[in-house]
């Protein structure tokens, strides 16, 4: 009620705060937009699209700010990947799509949910926040499992740099926001059937339309439903995988200014039970590249359910109120032998016979109001809001994960899972979070805008550890509070060229916040800040665009070994990164479009030590593990004849280190992909996709201090038939 009263008071201020009727989901008509629009759109609009490079900077983005400004007017590095372009390239997973954006590299493994990436020198689910339609599921035990498939995606927006001021704790490196397709009034149904290498079979359905299409004055109730099923025998022994996603939305335009949308998404994944191969001295035998050292009855399963109720109401001219209530459930199960080490006699020792089950439930609500108007004659947009979350997490496992075996490198019987440790409930946690946030954009002049933001988070945490045959039950509670803020300037040098600078702060938990251990309970959140400057430009009347960003991030309060006492851990560590990122898109005559980007960074531990055999060893100056310092992407698309398109792409990921000591060096890699499509008729399109054309053996990520490498998929391909009705 207090929040509603606050919003009512904002409405009362409307008399003194000269307002204009503006959709908060559209850019403010600054110098950039003034040349493009003479009137403002209605409050309820369809989701913007960015299918061509020329549109990417001019359309509003929602991941770098809640202000609804365009990328050109946002003082941050934001990139939009259109869903149609993603699917045209054959990128069926969110990770495949996102790692074509500047600076993002794949770190996905079964242990992190198959969705982890790195960017700007940071890696892990805690440091790169994943959103679904702007909503975050809190990270439990370093794992995020949804969203994962691109079939239902309208677009993916990525932000590079800290985002705590927008989404709370986490996101020191960046944000991935997966935005699903919305219901449309025009009826359309799409069916996809596909087959591919290694026994892949894919089926997908997407349908949308109006329930009351014949209603005089236009429909009020629209729907969207999707279904996707993908199964594969895998490229290595016991490599089967199967995923299913189903969901939809109902959208009610109750009045011209009031909209309700109810969304539900269900996903089931049974990914490949593969944890890589053992290596020594940064090398491995080529004979091991298609070996799977997991047990024969290994099992991994993820189940996710998301329900969201969204309300958008233009309460007054210039005042729009939005609310989203959400309920999410996730259940996960691992049943594996996950660690492998080469022995002196050439055999492979397997350990960590792990069985873990996660049950996570999250209920939350986000309410915000956007007020457009003028302050002393200057155009201003102001957002204020609150967010509440309650998260319950239960961990069941067979800790301390007893079980081991030794097998030959080749021609072995994989055996079955065997551990003397019982699988029992280990702990449960409850996390309650409350936040208040605000953003503001003031046009100081017709060409200069000041953008600022502030967020305060309060988190109450409790963990109950259950009693076992050898340990007593324990409990502890902890409270965290953090304030994040940012300030930035955007200067429009011309209507299509802007330069910007910003300073922002952020925070990360010491590990996953909702599964914080008692050993780490005394520590505060890790904090950080970023300086960033950049330039963005649209060229040739919209046929080309490019961006350039320079940044430096410093993250403090890392856990590090006490240099005077190797048995103690203290929170004084520091990690930093600085770098440059460039993106560009060019539309040429004869149907040729080129998208390209590159990133170069320097990431280092500035103050970080570890205990090695009871001795404190400094890692100062070393590169954080699993962080490539160079990445690059190019994709060329050519519509060489009516209905015909071909595409080709190259992806480069620089070398990385697999350990904090920087003794294990993981090689760089270059991958080549290609696609071709033919629209046979208005109702039918055929497509061919080829991946890793040179059959390059490459490392996706590493574990166990770099002695275990997870290899990527060899050369593969597939064909699809897409029917539209």
What residue spans do the PLM features occupy?
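Membrane-embedded beta-barrel scaffold of Gram-negative outer-membrane proteins
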Residues: 213, 310-314, 318-338, 492, ...
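Gram-negative outer-membrane beta-barrel transporters
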Residues: 552, 571-660, 694, 724
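N-terminal periplasmic accessory domains that precede
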Residues: 94-97, 115-118, 170-192, 203-209
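Structural signature of Gram-negative outer-membrane beta-barrels, strongest in the C-terminal barrel
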Residues: 251-255, 360, 379-381, 387-389, ...
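C-terminal beta-signal and adjacent terminal beta-strands/loops
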Residues: 594, 652-659, 677-725
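Extracytoplasmic beta-strand/coil segments of soluble accessory domains associated
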Residues: 63-79, 83, 89, 95-135, ...
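Short acidic/polar hinge/loop motifs at secondary-structure boundaries
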Residues: 135-160, 179-180
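Transmembrane beta-barrel wall of Gram-negative outer-membrane proteins
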Residues: 188-190, 195-274, 298-314, 455
């Amino acid at each position: 009620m207090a929040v509603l009263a606050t919003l009512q008071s904002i409405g009362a201020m409307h008399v003194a705060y000269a307002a204009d009727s503006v959709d908060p989901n559209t850019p403010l008509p600054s110098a950039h937009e003034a040349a493009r629009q003479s009137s403002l759109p209605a409050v309820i609009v369809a989701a913007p699209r960015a299918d061509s490079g020329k549109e990417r900077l001019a359309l509003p983005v929602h991941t770098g700010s809640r202000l609804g400004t365009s990328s050109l007017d946002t003082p941050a590095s934001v990139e939009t990947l259109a869903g149609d372009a993603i699917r045209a390239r054959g990128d069926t997973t969110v990770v495949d799509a996102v790692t074509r954006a500047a600076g993002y590299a794949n770190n996905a493994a079964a242990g992190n949910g198959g969705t982890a990436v790195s960017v700007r020198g940071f890696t892990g689910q805690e440091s790169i926040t994943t959103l679904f339609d702007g909503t975050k599921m809190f990270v439990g035990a370093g794992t995020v499992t949804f969203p994962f498939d691109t079939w239902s995606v309208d677009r993916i927006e990525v932000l590079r740099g800290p985002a705590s001021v927008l989404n709370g704790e986490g996101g020191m490196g960046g944000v991935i926001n997966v935005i699903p397709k919305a219901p449309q009034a025009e009826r359309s149904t799409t069916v996809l059937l596909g087959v591919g290498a290694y026994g892949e079979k894919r089926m997908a359905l997407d349908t949308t339309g109006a329930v009351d299409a014949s209603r005089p004055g236009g429909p009020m109730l629209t729907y969207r439903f999707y279904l996707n099923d993908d199964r594969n025998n895998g490229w290595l022994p016991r490599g089967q995988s199967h995923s299913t996603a189903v969901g939809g939305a109902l959208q009610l335009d109750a009045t011209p200014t009031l909209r309700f949308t109810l969304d539900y998404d269900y996903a089931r994944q049974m990914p490949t039970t593969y944890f890589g191969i053992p290596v020594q001295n940064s090398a491995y035998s080529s004979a091991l590249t298609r070996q799977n050292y997991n047990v024969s009855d290994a099992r991994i399963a993820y189940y996710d359910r998301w329900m969201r109720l969204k309300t958008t109401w233009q309460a007054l001219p210039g005042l729009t109120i939005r609310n989203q209530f959400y309920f999410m459930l996730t259940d996960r199960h691992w049943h594996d032998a996950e660690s492998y080490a080469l022995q002196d006699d050439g055999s492979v020792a397997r350990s960590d016979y792990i069985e873990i089950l996660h049950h996570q439930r999250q209920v939350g609500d986000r309410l915000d109001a956007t007020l457009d108007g003028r302050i002393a004659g200057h155009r201003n947009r102001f957002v204020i809001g609150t967010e509440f979350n309650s998260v319950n997490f239960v961990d069941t496992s067979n800790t301390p994960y007893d079980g081991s075996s030794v097998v030959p490198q080749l021609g072995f019987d994989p055996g079955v899972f065997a551990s003397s440790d019982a699988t029992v409930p280990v702990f449960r946690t409850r996390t309650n979070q409350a936040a208040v946030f605000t953003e503001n954009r003031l046009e100081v002049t017709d060409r200069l805008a000041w953008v600022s933001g502030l967020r305060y988070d309060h988190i109450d945490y409790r963990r109950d550890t259950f009693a076992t045959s050898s340990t007593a039950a324990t409990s502890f509670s902890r409270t965290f509070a953090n304030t994040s803020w940012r300030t930035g300037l955007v200067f429009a040098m011309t209507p299509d060229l802007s330069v910007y600078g910003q300073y922002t702060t952020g925070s990360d938990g010491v590990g996953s916040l909702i599964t914080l251990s008692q050993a780490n309970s005394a520590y505060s959140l890790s904090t950080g800040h970023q300086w960033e400057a950049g330039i963005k430009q649209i060229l040739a009347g919209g046929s080309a665009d490019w961006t350039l960003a320079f940044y430096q991030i410093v993250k403090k309060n890392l856990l590090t070994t006490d240099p005077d006492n190797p048995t103690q851990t203290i929170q004084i560590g520091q990690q930093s990164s600085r770098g440059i990122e460039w993106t560009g898109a060019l539309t040429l005559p004869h149907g040729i479009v080129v998208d390209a980007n590159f990133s170069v960074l320097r990431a280092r531990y500035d103050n970080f030590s570890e205990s090695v055999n009871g001795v404190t060893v400094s890692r100062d100056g070393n590169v954080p593990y699993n962080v490539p310092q160079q990445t690059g992407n190019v994709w060329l698309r050519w519509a060489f004849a009516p209905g015909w398109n071909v595409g080709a792409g190259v992806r480069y990921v620089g070398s990385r280190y697999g350990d904090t000591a920087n003794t294990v060096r993981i090689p760089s890699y270059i991958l080549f992909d290609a696609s071709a499509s033919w629209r046979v008729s208005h109702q039918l399109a055929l497509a061919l996709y080829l991946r890793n054309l040179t059959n390059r053996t490459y490392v996706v990520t590493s574990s166990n201090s770099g002695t275990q490498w997870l290899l990527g998929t060899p050369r593969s391909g597939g064909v699809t038939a897409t029917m539209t009705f």
